[in-house]
């Protein structure tokens, strides 16, 4: 069974910024396709749950400093893409 995907307005805004920066947007959609099919990602993308004010959200690395944040509901098979960008743009700090 495949997961369905929805996006937030913040994700769409950040996606436009990534396009403006020349990011390979197809790389992001390849990661999303794996998530849709499997509900999880290989370790190479460093998937992990976030904590504190981001509790309940997942994060992975599309590139070293290009992240995807999403909310996942395994019972409903839904993925909500909430944001994407650098550590600094998402969390206010550089990694």
What residue spans do the PLM features occupy?
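Enriched for short, Lys/Arg-rich terminal
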Residues: 1-4, 13-16, 20-23, 62-67, ...
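Residue-level signal for threonine
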Residues: 8
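PIN-domain endoribonuclease scaffold, especially VapC-family toxins
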Residues: 25-33
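Short connector loops at helix/strand junctions that flank enzyme active sites
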Residues: 29, 45, 55, 63-65, ...
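Terminal low-complexity, poorly structured segments
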Residues: 31, 37, 46, 75-76, ...
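Short alpha-helical linear motifs
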Residues: 31, 52-54, 69-73
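A short, surface-exposed loop/turn module that caps and links secondary-structure elements
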Residues: 34-61
């Amino acid at each position: 069974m495949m997961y369905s995907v929805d996006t937030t307005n913040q994700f769409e805004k950040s996606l436009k910024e990534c396009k403006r920066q020349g990011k390979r947007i197809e790389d992001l959609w390849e990661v999303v396709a794996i998530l849709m099919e499997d509900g999880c990602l290989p370790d190479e993308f460093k998937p992990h749950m976030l904590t504190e004010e981001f509790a309940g959200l997942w994060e992975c690395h599309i590139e070293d400093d290009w992240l995807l944040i999403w909310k996942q509901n395994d019972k409903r098979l839904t993925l909500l893409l909430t944001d994407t960008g650098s550590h600094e743009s998402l969390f206010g700090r550089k990694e």
